Amino acid sequence: MTQANLSETLFKPRFKHPETSTLVRRFNHGAQPPVQSALDGKTIPHWYRMINRLMWIWRGIDPREILDVQARIVMSDAERTDDDLYDTVIGYRGGNWIYEWATQAMVWQQKACAEEDPQLSGRHWLHAATLYNIAAYPHLKGDDLAEQAQALSNRAYEEAAQRLPGTMRQMEFTVPGGAPITGFLHMPKGDGPFPTVLMCGGLDAMQTDYYSLYERYFAPRGIAMLTIDMPSVGFSSKWKLTQDSSLLHQHVLKALPNVPWVDHTRVAAFGFRFGANVAVRLAYLESPRLKAVACLGPVVHTLLSDFKCQQQVPEMYLDVLASRLGMHDASDEALRVELNRYSLKVQGLLGRRCPTPMLSGYWKNDPFSPEEDSRLITSSTADGKLLEIPFNPVYRNFDKGLQEITDWIEKRLC
């Protein structure tokens, strides 16, 4: 089946698809303060979704392309769930968030098919995969159209990997008590086995969102990167996120001695946002299997246990948390009680001495991850490094922070 035909088949109208902002039915807090964060973007009036320009540009999307798609959404006069929110157009049609970003992805998909140069074609496929992922953002459970966009993203990513430098292998991992999960092992040029970083991504991202991290930071140093989706999304969608947040990643770690391309004696974990919750749990529970753990903007305690902090967080992000926990109809009070159980301090881990070296990077006044969370992580180990990343200029400092983190990981792996 051609890519174009796959797109037509997946998005063929069958019934009135639920609109993304309606999928989680919590009691609304009302007006929220504006939020700006390096890793999550910022709240913009009249948008349900946080607009995450930094990360989208970092993944290779042109800022003008972002504005063009936003303009098409704004200009639509189609019916919306909430007339005050541009990105709540109902149905797969012009103005709908998923429709507009997927349409943009199809433009690049067609360019990829027409391009004869393999590397350039691979770049176009990767661009299409990223746009399909933005279409599916924030990846709420039960969002049928978003899940179809994710399927197209994975397909485009596989096409890209066949053409881009290095080697990528799609791997299946068995997890007792449930469905197997699929991960992607990205390997640099040269002979393996390679030192490897196990990526633990954020809750509002897919494993295919981190190719830039591999290409710009790990591959030049001869380090491989292994990704899996977080519980409840993508290839891990059959698994619900539980208080044992590191369950899937633990089973992957245990399987690495049987993966010939990975040097299982030289493995580190790297956690973005809630992925740091997973990575730090691994530091405690699987320390013999890990040389180091690095975190960026970690969500390990405060956001999960502090009501005032939760009140500062945008509705969309709380919807993401509720969706991952399978609490689509829960009250805010029930959600708060459940989130508290995910705090690694409440679980009795953070604060105890940890044998694994840990680094944590943070931004001052980050509404999702205060400095205290990073200090809690780095003070729990004898080999801890606290890294403050200045906010402005945001892109340059983000890149500099990732270079420093990669330096730190490399010293412990190589």
From Swiss-Prot:
Keyword Mitochondrion included in the entry's annotation: no
Record field: catalytic activity: a carboxylic ester + H2O = an alcohol + a carboxylate + H(+)
Broad class of enzyme this protein falls into: hydrolase
Pfam families for the chain: FrsA-like (PF06500)
GO molecular function term, any single one: carboxylesterase activity
Keyword field: Hydrolase, Serine esterase
Stated family: Belongs to the FrsA family.
Name of the protein: Esterase FrsA
Organism: Escherichia coli O17:K52:H18 (strain UMN026 / ExPEC)
